[in-house]
From Swiss-Prot:
Binding annotation for ATP: L20, G21, K22, G23, A24, Y25, G26, I27, V28, K43
Written domain comment of the UniProt record: C-terminal domain, rather than the kinase activity, is required for the full function of the enzyme. This region may be a protein interaction domain that regulates kinase localization, activation and transcriptional activity. When C-terminally truncated, the enzyme shows a reduction in the Thr-Glu-Tyr (TEY) phosphorylation level, in the in vitro kinase activity, in its nuclear localization and in its inhibitory effect on cell growth.
Protein name: Mitogen-activated protein kinase 15
Keywords linked to the UniProt accession: ATP-binding, Cell junction, Cell projection, Cytoplasm, Cytoplasmic vesicle, Cytoskeleton, Golgi apparatus, Kinase, Methylation, Nucleotide-binding, Nucleus, Phosphoprotein, Repeat, Serine/threonine-protein kinase, Tight junction, Transferase, Ubl conjugation
Origin species: Rattus norvegicus
Basic and acidic residues bias (residue ranges): 401-414, 491-500
CDD domains attached to this UniProt entry: STKc_MAPK15-like
Length: 547
């Protein structure tokens, strides 16, 4: 690792272990928090505010992760650290072992139970997002992270949009641009429909399910026209009413040219041993008309994931998500950066631990306590990820029907970062932001303090905070870590780490599934790289924090 790649104030806080991947727009490292011993993934985004598009995407992703990060199937953003050059930015995430794209590419590593388990967790995350009237718009295997216990974390919210900020039309909300990966785009997106609904995510989930069942993408189109061609050769042709409902100006002309081509059935694309309930769910998700696709809540009740279904653990938000800056307000890149840095400085002054009451989810305290006591059943560990010790078998929770299926349960972890993102629904926003603030739970006060918006003053404040310690006059003037619990100053003893014999991680390996969209839009990938099977077996288990 080149020392110049990591700013000094970042390396003082996190011990960089190794680089997981590098692309044109960023680097991802595996690291360890020097204070807590927690293993994390640090993503450095190059020129995160190079233009209005990238600045808005960075701002949007951080704000949405703030809203959704309390869900067990959505990646947790632990820390946001501005770079010294005032252009790059560091995002610190919880560490995951691999992504679904890498696992599928290895071939025959997932048993039927693993596929059901993974898809159930994806549906659970999607239901939570949609309950806040947000659509992800970029669900694909590379954005589905996995760990050794087969736990799923949905990531990369840079293209997500809040439907609350857009006018509603006859078929949904009006969105102006869409640049997600082509292979997972819904027909209404390919046909430039003027109205989008949560159905675009359900189509993407259908494509992900089909790819897990088939072992390769269902519709690997090389162009928009070819993508439509592959889709309409497989699913039932739409009716005239369904075409008119899309609100597309030229959908009828395109479909007229494609409707006479030879056809094939969806089950012909899948292996002969595909479970009948999997095929049925796939057909219900890959319906041409968005309003005829299953919703996430309906799909959770489908027989394919019935053994995991437990309504008390399938959370919903109590209110819509509204970003601090209205989606319709186009700020300049420096304005997005200033707003974000103001919020970082404000959070550092008011660092506090998140409370369960602030999560903005409909879940009882008893269910939350039960979720902390249980973990994923060890019988569903995929062989490719079996690098951690097996967990003890816990009691199986009962569902509302009285029988005892296997359930997915993810233990919530705690962390004390210097910059603790506020809990969802805290209602806080930067000074001067337009639009409505997020709805706050009853009894939760919002705090908005004025911060000088100039970059000079912010840089000075940042430089003063770079050592990540401050003096505490009340405790005798000694240094203390802001927002962190006190732990012994001695670092956890590191286990010897074997040097890899070959290149283990590479962003380019999964480029086929990502398509050329990333290069075209000038964005960045949040994939954590591709992991080979032998490399996973050599990954050392880092010790946790000492008592």
């Amino acid at each position: 690792m080149c020392a110049a790649e990591v700013d000094r104030h970042v390396s003082q806080r996190y011990l960089i272990k190794r680089r997981l991947g590098k692309g044109a727009y960023g680097i991802v490292w595996k690291a360890m928090d020097r204070r807590t011993g927690e293993v994390v993934a640090i993503k450095k985004i190059f020129d995160a505010f190079r233009d209005q598009t990238d600045a808005q995407r960075t701002f949007r992703e951080i704000m949405l992760l703030r809203e959704f990060g309390g869900h067990p199937n959505i990646i947790r953003l632990l820390d946001v650290i501005p770079a010294k050059n005032d252009r790059d930015i560091y995002l610190v995430f919880e560490s995951m072992d691999t992504d679904l794209n890498a696992v599928i590419q290895k071939g025959r590593l997932l048993e039927d139970i693993h596929k059901r388990c993974i898809f159930y967790q994806l549906l659970r995350a999607t239901k939570f997002i949609h309950s806040g009237r947000v659509i992800h718009r970029d669900q694909k295997p590379a954005n589905v992270l996995l760990d050794a216990a087969c736990r799923v974390k949905l990531c990369d919210f840079g293209l997500a949009r809040s439907l609350s900020d857009f006018p509603e039309g006859p078929g949904g909300q009006a969105l102006t641009e869409y640049v997600a990966t082509r292979w997972y785009r819904a027909p209404e997106v390919l046909l430039s429909s003027r109205w989008y609904t949560p159905g675009v995510d359900m189509w993407s989930l259908g494509c992900i399910l089909g790819e897990m069942l088939r072992g390769q993408p269902l519709f690997p189109g090389t162009s928009t026209f070819h993508q439509l061609e592959l889709i309409l050769e497989t699913i039932p042709l739409p009716s005239m009413e369904e075409l008119q409902g899309l609100g597309s100006d030229y959908s009828a002309l395109i479909l007229q040219n494609l409707g006479s081509r030879p056809r094939q059935t969806l089950d012909a694309l899948l292996p002969p041993d595909t479970p009948p309930e999997a095929l049925d769910l796939l057909k219900r998700l890959l319906a041409f008309a968005p309003d005829k696709r299953l919703s996430a809540e309906q799909a959770l009740q489908h027989p394919y994931v019935q053994r995991f279904h437990c309504p008390d653990r399938e959370w919903t938000r109590g209110s819509d998500v509204r970003l601090p800056v209205h989606e319709g307000d186009q700020l300049s890149a420096p304005e997005y950066r200033n707003r974000l840095y103001q919020m970082i400085l404000e959070r550092r002054r008011n660092s506090r631990s998140p409370r369960e009451e602030d999560l903005g989810v409909v879940a009882s305290r008893a269910e939350l306590r039960a979720s902390q006591r249980q973990s994923l059943k060890p019988g569903v560990l995929p062989q490719v990820l079996a690098e951690t010790p097996a967990r003890k078998r816990g009691p199986k929770p009962q569902n509302g029907h009285g029988h005892d299926p296997e359930h997915v349960e993810v233990r919530r972890q705690s962390s004390d970062p210097l910059y603790q993102l506020p809990p969802p629904g805290s209602g806080e926003r930067p000074p001067g932001a337009t639009g409505e603030p997020p709805s706050a739970p009853s009894g939760v006060k919002t705090h908005v303090r004025a911060v000088a918006p100039s970059l000079t003053s912010q840089a000075a404040a940042q430089a003063a905070n770079q050592p990540l310690i401050r003096s505490d006059p009340a405790r005798g003037g000694g240094p203390r870590a802001v927002g962190a619990r006190r732990v012994p100053s001695r670092l956890p003893r590191e286990a010897p780490e074997p040097r890899p014999g070959r290149r283990m991680f590479g962003i380019s390996v999964s480029q086929g599934a990502q398509g050329a969209a990333r290069a075209a839009l000038g964005g960045y990938s949040q994939a954590y790289g591709t992991v080979c099977r032998s490399a996973l077996g050599r990954l050392p288990l880092l010790p946790g924090p000492r008592a």
